[in-house]
């Protein structure tokens, strides 16, 4: 039986390419992109005080654009290209037609798809770092920090863990979709950069939800983040397979469990549940399951949700207020707790719950000496040593990511502050968006609201609308 003409290989659809896999990978990449733009843009712009809404959203928006430009120019090849040293690839462009239309190093789709998919992950990582720096970092310093960090920090961790030639990848570390590469890195780097930049002005350090300017929009941004995680974890196998389906289901089950536990703890200890708490529980659940999504069973995903909803809650709500060092570092979006702590937890729990069969299906290797969770190693005679080894590798990767990011992020901050101040000056800290961008996110609330009649181009400097002709409708008025 002959195949339909649209399924036959041709120059645009080579024999090696699977159209279904390619379509899913592009969809997954777009979903991850939507987590950033507009997901985190909305979330950041809504969680901060209204005087910092524009700046917070802009930092995320700029980071995404800047990273993608660096990514195709040199960073992709440094992360996944030909090995230069054991932890880094050779810098090179990823824009050549011959390269982009060729087969990716994994999956049955072209390099162009892989470059885009991995690029949106890199962009998201920098936006997560921004969450620890909102409300006081000099925007010019941020514009320098972004390309430097993606070049000298992200690429090293990505190559080491995700590239087949990376030293931790060869060791057998399990990081299904970025618990180490993205979340642990972002949490540690954000916390380190926050140390160097310093805290926000006292007036801006109100606790949530008092500082939040629009809680409904917080939920909108959080919803985009949550649903976009279907592409985040579901695209990790690089194939539209059963493992992708399992990863997506585990992601949402773990997240639901984490939210439930966090909200219950808030209710028990503080007397009432909060939207802010639910969103934090959502993030910790999503982060914790990320390194394990497609290689653990459903019941393990629920247990991981219980743990991710409780331990980060304790470190954030209790321990943070008791440890002087933690109190001194201003982390507006609690990136350290929701990403560094939750990411490290996820990595350790992955080493415990990873199912050998699922790992074999994901990594497509017959090597049973690797990728064996400790829980399964203890159940099988002769595999205990392999399970213990896997836990050691997982912890080894955590130590590497933490140490490298603290060192490199500190070095980048020190270099940037030689060029421009890391921190905004006093006037800008007091004024916020108006001083930095000359824009106001909430013009209706401005003390100097002005209305312009578009047809006559007349400006009314008063809130008394009696001077406006009755024939003019509000639809013809525009705020300035």
Swiss-Prot record:
Keywords: Ammonia transport, Cell membrane, Glycoprotein, Membrane, Transmembrane, Transmembrane helix, Transport. Induction: Accumulates in roots, in a RAM1-dependent manner, during colonization by arbuscular mycorrhizal (AM) fungi (e.g. Glomus versiforme). Glycans are attached at residue 111. Its main location: membrane. Residues 49-51, 135-141, 197-214, 264-274, 320-334, 416-480 are cytoplasmic. This is Ammonium transporter 2 member 4. It comes from the Eukaryota. Residues 1-27, 73-113, 163-175, 236-242, 296-298, 356-394 are extracellular. Belongs to the ammonia transporter channel (TC 1.A.11.2) family. Pfam families: Ammonium_transp. The chain crosses the membrane at residues 28-48, 52-72, 114-134, 142-162, 176-196, 215-235, 243-263, 275-295, 299-319, 335-355, 395-415. It is found in: Cell membrane. It comes from Medicago truncatula (Barrel medic). One of its GO terms (molecular function) is ammonium channel activity. InterPro entries: Ammonium/urea_transptr, Ammonium_transpt, Ammonium_transpt_CS, NH4_transpt_AmtB-like_dom, RhesusRHD. Involved in ammonium transport. May be involved in arbuscular mycorrhizal (AM) symbiosis with AM fungi. One of its GO terms (biological process) is ammonium transmembrane transport. It is a multi-pass membrane protein. One of its GO terms (cellular component) is plasma membrane. The keyword Cell membrane applies. PROSITE patterns: AMMONIUM_TRANSP. Coiled coil: none annotated. Disruption phenotype: Normal arbuscular mycorrhizal (AM) symbiosis with AM fungi.
